Regions:
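Hinge/lid segment of periplasmic solute-binding proteins
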Residues: 90-140, 166-168, 174, 194, ...
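Short, solvent-exposed loop/beta-turn-alpha elements that line the ligand-binding surface or hinge
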Residues: 103-117, 158, 181-185, 202-222, ...
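Extracytoplasmic "Venus flytrap"/periplasmic binding protein-like
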Residues: 46-118, 124, 150-152, 249, ...
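Extracytoplasmic/periplasmic solute-binding protein
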Residues: 130-134, 139, 164-212, 255
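A structural signal for short loop-to-beta-strand junctions that line the ligand-binding cleft
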Residues: 83-84, 112-147, 179, 287-289, ...
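Conserved C-terminal helix/tail region of periplasmic/extracytoplasmic solute-binding proteins
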Residues: 52-53, 58, 149-150, 155, ...
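Glycine-centered hinge/linker elements that transmit conformational signals in sensory
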Residues: 166-171, 210-239
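C-terminal lobe and pocket-closing loops
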Residues: 41, 94, 262-276, 283-380, ...
């Protein structure tokens, strides 16, 4: 094994903590690791359907808590005792693939065309797909209409640009007891996701289609500068807050504006907030509304001896009809594919519209050789600017240079 491969495998193993090892999957079963504490009713029904049609390959699900799920999957794969198929963050696929731990899951052109823009790209590198998208998350802009009104702003008019967002945040901070804007900058993966939303609302990129690191660009400098400029009008000490903690402040009406998933709609209503939702404000180079496009995927692991049948099972679970049933049952997942049923859902619940509108000009979560390394570099960059330890240009240059080792 060469040095670079040992290093990356060590990085993968470091993710795994002290999770115990399980035995190799038996040939007659399809072992699947799902994250959470319950098998959803939709999956229970689909497993029963599969078992009836494929009695020689019954499904054996294993539930692992969200905090340990990725770690256990990684531990089993690195140890050479892989599960057949597992729920993973798509950001890990490149690292798994380069270490020969998973197999490609090719998509036909017809399959690719069935998804929203860029969804296949979240699982693709070197021209191959390495996972099957199974969950999709996008973000939109939420605001507290009552706090807008208290600050002298039109409660029905959200900011459309970064410039307006900062001006509104300043006006709210100066005229109410609330912070203007909710900023996420804690040492947590959500900080990376959150800044990527800024990159993708200004036509920026981290790594291009040819595998070049392009973080140090005018578009991303504008994003990091706008990020810095809104700090004075955000909650105090943003490096102490991750997204759920910022959401809690918003729900307590301690801040007026934040970027959030669709979950903020129901939570806001339950909290009695007079809220609105719109596409994320955009930067000067934006071509339209954008957002980070995050997917989780089903990865098929190498070495089980039944990879082809497992791929068939994964595609059964995520067929358009079955995937839509899963998404609608979960309630907080952005649909992976457009359909008449999705159109009907948006017509019934118009607050979904911004979460779909941002897809067209959004961008996928970057696939790098060491996602933890990437995450650490990005968090350090963001925090150095938020705290004033570095200026945006210097922080961007430093981060771009450090990312070269992970491309």
């Amino acid at each position: 094994m060469n040095i670079s491969k040992r290093f990356v495998l060590a990085s993968l193993a470091a993710l795994s903590g002290t999770t115990g090892l399980a035995g190799m999957a038996s040939a007659e079963e399809i072992n699947i690791i799902l994250c959470g504490d319950v098998v959803t009713p939709v999956y229970t029904k689909l497993f029963e359907e599969w078992n009836a049609a494929n009695p020689d390959y019954p499904v054996a699900p294993e539930l692992v808590g969200w905090g340990q799920c990725q770690d256990k999957v990684t531990t089993l794969a690195v140890a050479g005792t892989p599960v057949d198929i597992a729920y993973v963050g798509s950001r890990t696929l490149k690292q798994f693939a380069l270490n020969d731990l998973i197999v490609p899951v090719p998509m036909s052109d017809e399959e690719k065309a069935g998804y929203y823009n860029f969804v296949p790209e979240t699982v693709t590198f070197d021209g191959q797909q390495w996972g099957i998208p199974v969950a999709f998350s996008t973000k939109a802009f939420f605001w507290n209409k009552d706090l807008f009104e208290q600050a002298g702003l039109d409660p029905e008019t959200p900011p459309r640009t970064w410039e307006e967002q900062q001006a509104f945040a300043k006006q709210i901070s100066e005229n109410t007891d609330a912070a203007g804007f909710g900023m996420i900058a804690k040492t947590f993966d959500g900080t990376v996701h959150w800044f990527l939303h800024w990159i993708y609302t200004n036509n920026g990129q981290v790594i291009d289609a040819d595998g070049n690191i392009v973080l140090n660009s005018p578009q991303n400098l504008a994003a990091l500068t706008a990020f810095k400029d809104i700090v004075p009008y955000s909650e105090e000490g943003p490096t102490a807050y991750e997204q759920n903690e910022v959401r809690a402040i918003w729900l307590d009406e301690g801040l007026a504006m934040m970027h959030c998933s669709v979950s903020c709609a129901n939570r806001g209503t339950e909290a009695g907030i007079n809220w609105g939702v719109a596409p994320l404000p955009v930067g000067p180079d934006a071509q339209g509304p954008g957002t980070l496009l995050i997917t989780d995927s089903l990865a098929v692991f190498k070495g089980t001896g039944q990879e082809d049948k497992v791929i068939e099972f994964g595609k059964f679970l995520t067929s358009p009809e079955n995937q839509l049933a899963y998404e609608l049952s979960e309630g907080g997942l952005t649909p992976l594919r457009p359909s008449p049923e999705v159109d009907a859902m948006i017509a019934e619940k118009p607050h979904w519209q911004p979460f779909v509108d941002g897809i067209e000009f959004g961008g996928p979560e970057p696939l790098l050789t060491d996602y933890v390394g990437f995450q650490n570099v990005m968090i350090e960059m963001v925090q150095s600017v938020v705290t004033g330890a570095a200026e945006p240009q210097a922080a961007l240059e430093k981060a771009a240079a450090e990312l070269e080792q992970y491309k």
